[in-house]
């Protein structure tokens, strides 16, 4: 099987790679487990030196790394530069804090000594998507390797050069060659790797369907798995909110990464008394967005990742319109070469339509009108997903209600949802299990050992 990387801006094939054979995968898994036996014994200080060096490389090479990201998956160049810098931040954060996060925890018991020790699990299968081709991977690398684990990466098939470059950065930073290896393979080979006794656990960021497959595969083998899946994040705007700011941030939250982010705002839930003004200005700002070449500094929205993404998004929009939704702007692919979709706003959305029930992955905003906070919470929670939620209100009582009652792993008040190494990232319901980042993220891939000395 060949793995081709295609420029979504032009539709042209950039490069083609051969998939690894089963024998080649076996060699890499053996190299990983052999490396783990020595890598786990390194001190936190030794691993931190490598991680800081990785951060320095990410920062010094941010422009070339950004160019590669934009070339392979179409994010705007300036956002790709930001992504490289954010990866460096995560590396530095865990280099500084990993030892503290995983320090022995003393427990008061009748024993002469009793404590909890966190130890690395081993070889982790890392399955990552294309939408943040560096950041999604470094969200595992920084905590995972600082904890003493090693990783094998099955990256999305449309970003193979990004995957190989990540491995190159780590080797250049001084990590052993077996500490983090890229597997250029198809999805059909994943279950075999998950079944391999040398693989201790898995982490996946991806679709709900992929999560079900990998999660059930891990369960069959009694292996730990962390799943960060889809989101249909609500963006609630109440009468007391700063409306101008909410609209400006809402636009950014919807079209970030060309609308292809699990934590992008997708369902705009707006109080009736401000809905007309919100809707009018929101549509006006969406229509002003510049769609085009992601290498152009003036571009706001680049292409979707591939032609299949355009087809899927158009199918969801068309089905929603057929069910009764109205298009206020956009609603179709752009008349441009490549995989472009017009910034779109939908209203009057029926409950049985994709715009209500599914995660629309692209620059499509769905607006819902509600009477009050009660209805806003009900509509927001009427989803099988529960990743992030953003609520805009200056009413303290409403803020507390949203914090307590929204069914989401992350609730941001008067701010768009984003990831930050200092706080846990993850969702509830069908948005996944486990957490990434923060203290919680680094402990996900450790064995928690109870020690009791009489």
Regions found by a protein language model. Name each.
Residues 8, 22-25, 44, 62, ...:
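Residues at or immediately preceding the N-termini of alpha-helices
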Residues 14, 209-350, 373, 413:
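ALDH superfamily catalytic-core signature
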């Amino acid at each position: 099987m060949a793995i081709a990387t295609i420029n979504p801006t032009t539709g042209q094939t950039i490069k083609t790679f051969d998939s690894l054979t089963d024998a080649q995968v076996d060699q890499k898994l053996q190299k990983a487990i052999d490396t783990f036996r020595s890598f786990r014994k390194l001190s936190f200080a030794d691993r931190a030196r490598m991680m800081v060096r990785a951060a320095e490389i990410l920062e010094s090479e941010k422009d070339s790394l950004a160019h590669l990201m934009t070339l392979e998956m179409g994010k705007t160049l300036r956002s790709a530069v930001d992504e490289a810098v954010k990866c460096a931040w995560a590396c530095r954060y865990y280099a500084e804090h990993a030892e503290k996060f995983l320090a022995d925890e003393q427990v008061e018991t009748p024993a002469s000594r009793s404590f909890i020790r966190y130890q690395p699990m081993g070889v982790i299968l890392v399955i990552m998507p294309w939408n943040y081709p560096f950041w999604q991977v470094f969200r595992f690398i920084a905590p995972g390797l600082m904890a003493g684990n090693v990783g094998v990466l099955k990256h999305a098939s449309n970003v193979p050069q990004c995957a190989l470059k990540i491995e190159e950065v780590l080797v250049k930073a001084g990590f052993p060659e077996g500490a983090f290896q890229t597997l250029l393979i198809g999805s059909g080979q994943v279950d075999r790797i998950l079944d391999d006794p040398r693989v201790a656990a898995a982490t996946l960021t991806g679709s709900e369907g992929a999560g079900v497959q990998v999660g059930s595969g891990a369960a069959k083998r009694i292996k730990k798995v962390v799943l960060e899946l889809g989101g249909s994040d609500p963006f609630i705007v109440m009468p007391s909110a700063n409306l101008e700011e909410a609209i400006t941030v809402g636009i950014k939250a919807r079209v970030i990464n060309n609308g292809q982010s699990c934590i992008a705002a997708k369902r705009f839930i707006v109080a009736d008394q401000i809905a007309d003004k919100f809707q009018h200005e929101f549509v006006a700002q969406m229509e002003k967005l510049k769609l085009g070449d992601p290498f152009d500094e003036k571009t706001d929205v680049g292409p979707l990742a591939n032609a299949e993404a355009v087809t899927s998004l158009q199918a969801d929009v068309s089905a929603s319109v057929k069910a009764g939704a109205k298009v206020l702007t956009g609603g179709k692919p752009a008349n441009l070469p490549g995989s472009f979709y017009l910034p779109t706003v939908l209203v009057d959305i029926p409950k049985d339509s994709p715009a209500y029930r599914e995660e629309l992955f692209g620059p499509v905003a769905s607006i819902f009108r509600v009477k009050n906070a009660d209805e806003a919470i009900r509509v927001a929670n009427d989803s099988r997903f529960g990743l992030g939620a953003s609520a805009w209100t200056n009413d303290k009582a409403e803020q507390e209600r949203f914090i307590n009652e929204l069914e989401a792993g992350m609730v941001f008040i008067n701010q768009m949802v984003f990831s930050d190494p200092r706080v846990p990232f993850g969702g509830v319901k069908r948005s996944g299990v486990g957490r990434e980042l923060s203290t919680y993220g680094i402990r996900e891939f450790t064995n928690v050992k109870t020690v009791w000395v009489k």
